[in-house]
């Protein structure tokens, strides 16, 4: 009798157990379906969610407004040209002008014919455009997860998703090949001196992650033309001239790029991006004043060692005064003021060059 009851209980429990099992499985399926229906945000969407719709729209409009002549080009081309910063030629000029100084000073030192100087200036102009573009592309590849945390840079091609990293790397290869073609058109000394600069160009974007002085590395890259200018016209590399000229330009670059960095300092604090703007803070202006005086001293040494004429010193003194006045007047807490001061350095760089060019022309005409 007991055995019969036990068997009946087990039989009655089996349907209950199977029902419970089915219910459990169905609940798991429903739960998984509900989880899978939740939207999966990309890293780009997560980053952009930190900004208000108004900030995102303002960044987009600012980017489109700055395209200028590039708006007339095919839409597919534009992001790649933006990687080169073709819509912002300030950096290209600031890279190129020290090359002009060195080329013209080297031509002055050996009384090189005008066509030799013009040829070198033409090749360096193409090279600076291409290699500055390559440097910006490298910077955007490294910084794609930092640029999306700063309002001014979140619309850059890689950060905004308009260009993928593999596409950017391929475009970098094209630019490097074009830069190599320019180098091969110059004397061999320019080739190996130019190749020595590549590690600095590649390493610069990493410096803002672990040091407050990435501007020091960038200044090395932007001063390298002071070394290349001499062999470009067939002159021996006179280190007594090239080194003080290099240091003078290094200081100048450190000055204007620190002013530039003050534009983003509030965003940089939260993004973990380091710069001299954050390192120096309220002491920035006194430091930049001292650096500008030192810049003038090294520039004068370069002129003395190259036996330059009056144009070099008159124009140089005026240019240094402009930089000092720029440091005095710039409002480091105002983005527009910082940008205006930064871009004014193009005119300052040309003033330096006009003084050197004046002496060179006087030499060719036989007045020096």
Stretch-by-stretch model annotation:
Residues 104-105, 184-186, 207, 231-232, ...:
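Helix-loop junctions at the membrane-solvent interface of multi-pass transporters
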Residues 1-64:
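N-terminal mitochondrial targeting presequence
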Residues 96-142, 152, 173-183, 191-202, ...:
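Membrane-embedded alpha-helical segments that form the functional core of polytopic membrane enzymes
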Residues 73-78, 301-368:
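Extended hydrophobic alpha-helices typical of membrane-associated regions
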Residues 92-99, 171-178, 218-227, 288-300, ...:
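Core segments of transmembrane alpha-helices
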Residues 77, 81-82, 134, 153-244, ...:
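Intramembrane alpha-helical segments
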Residues 123-126, 144-194, 270-312:
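Multi-pass membrane catalytic core of lipid/isoprenoid biosynthesis enzymes
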